[in-house]
UniProtKB/Swiss-Prot annotation:
GO terms for biological process: translation. The keyword RNA-binding applies. It comes from Opitutus terrae (strain DSM 11246 / JCM 15787 / PB90-1). Keywords: Ribonucleoprotein, Ribosomal protein, RNA-binding, rRNA-binding. Disulfide bonds: none annotated. Binds 16S rRNA, required for the assembly of 30S particles and may also be responsible for determining the conformation of the 16S rRNA at the A site. One of its GO terms (molecular function) is structural constituent of ribosome. The lineage of its organism: Bacteria, Pseudomonadati, Verrucomicrobiota, Opitutia, Opitutales. This is Small ribosomal subunit protein uS14. Part of the 30S ribosomal subunit. Contacts proteins S3 and S10. It comes from the Bacteria.
Length: 101
């Protein structure tokens, strides 16, 4: 089980990313627009740098919803491979069966 602080830090990053998503997208659009003047470009760049580091979507780590494990995350089910195996063998994931040939 990972430290609670790591899980809470990730939750904070998710919250910050959602909170600043619109502003970040607006500034990125200004930077991507080729018709932007130099003053507007550098102004948008400065504002983007002033946003919190953790408000960037890239800094969010996918974690297992049951155990909090950050590695071997299966996105379709939202759990790690270990939890996925336990749930699948217990028959708690509909449509998932153990392969046999």
């Amino acid at each position: 089980m990972p430290k609670t602080s790591a899980i809470e830090r990730n939750k904070k990053r998710i919250r910050l990313a959602a909170q600043h998503a619109a502003k970040r997208a607006e500034l990125k659009a200004i930077l991507a627009n080729p018709a932007t003047t130099d003053d507007e470009f550098f102004g948008a760049q400065k504002k983007l740098q002033k946003l919190p580091k953790n408000s960037n979507k890239i800094r969010i780590r996918n974690r297992c919803s049951l155990s909090g494990r950050p590695r071997a995350y299966i996105g379709k089910f939202g759990v790690s491979r270990i939890q996925f195996r336990e749930l699948a063998l217990a028959g708690k994931i509909p449509g998932v069966t153990k392969s046999s040939w």
